[in-house]
Amino acid sequence: MKRRPLLAAGLTLTLAIAASACGSSSKFGDPDAGGTGGEDGGTFNPGDAQVRDPIGSLSGRVLAPEGTIPISNALVYLVAAPPAPFPDGVFCDKCVVLDKSVPSTFSKADGTFELPAYDEGMQYLVVQKGQFRRSRPIVVGKGKQTVPDGMTKLPPRKNLAVPGGGTDEIPKMAVVTGQWDKIEVSLAKLGLGAIKPGFLGVPEVDRSTIAFDMIDNPSGFLDNEAALSKYNIVFIPCSFSSGTTCSTSSPAGNPSVKTALQNFVAAGGKLYTTDYSYEFMRQPWPGYVDWVGQTNQLGSACQGGEYDSPAMANDPGLAAWLSAIGISNLQTQANWTTIDKVNPKTGKDKDGNTVTVSPKVWVTSLNTPSGAKPATVSFEAGCGRVLFSTYHTEAMNNGLLPQEQALLYVLLEVAVCTTQEAPR
């Protein structure tokens, strides 16, 4: 399934769509908001407002690890000590309400925030989106203070003993490697590693620098529950394919692979798949999403050619973020599968209760060969989430494409805590 490089406009849509693709609604602030860690290493949502008058405020911007991309709906708050670390490996990140004595706010679509302060002296400023979290000591005084970007930039890797005080945490991620959809390069461009020239000058990651694991033997990984449980996010991009076949989808039909992926997500893991790897969503979780052309045969929904389409961001938070980074004309480019529709199904929530799960459509391609159809969808399964996009990131140069920025948005959204409310 050889692909051409995507154009920036189309890339933007892909990223933006996927970016919003996962997360649970919160009754605090914007529904796309993530949380922040608590004493048990879990995640907080803001509580009720303070009853005191503030003595001042802290203002700044929340940025991606690479230092320029704004992060919307990140939780920002002040506490007396850094939050306890997240648990190692997969865990059920349930939202907990911050005590009303804790000053907190969310960043806007352009990443800016203004946080009220109620006490003077040394405190810790915490910035978190999903399981990306940074805490830094700060001396709070009366009046308005501007916070340096370095204190509110999401961390590029884990460090629980930052010189000068504070902590950095990121989710543990695994990328299944292959021929196509080099998500690892996009992750590196977003600040999670370094890239170097590869064959014919096409960029590749410098594996000695990356903050995630690359899985070169998926057949020995995807059916291994113990191996999967070491991670918070697993990427299965359109990677294994050769030519225009779906031969690499076959591992998804293995009962041990299906069971391992189901258990990983139910325990709190996040699974991200793209186009020809759609079977890794369809086989473990049948019926939530229907694809055009699908039959009982593995790979039946794979198309022999690609298509581009103008698109629409269905989610208001995603649309606002795209506008904030200057993207107005959405497109999905190099789609190799087409979603027909999503379906409500009976499933389990994070506590094992039987619920109706309705997949969320984040982006719609408006002009597919079958008309307007979903392009990025997600749903919750147990305590985790599953995300799929009909297109993928194409990393053919050293520049940071809009779709690669959207990939960051995806990472953050799939890692937010789960609530009692409807899945997103």
Regions found by a protein language model. Name each.
Residues R61-S72, V79-A84:
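Structural motif
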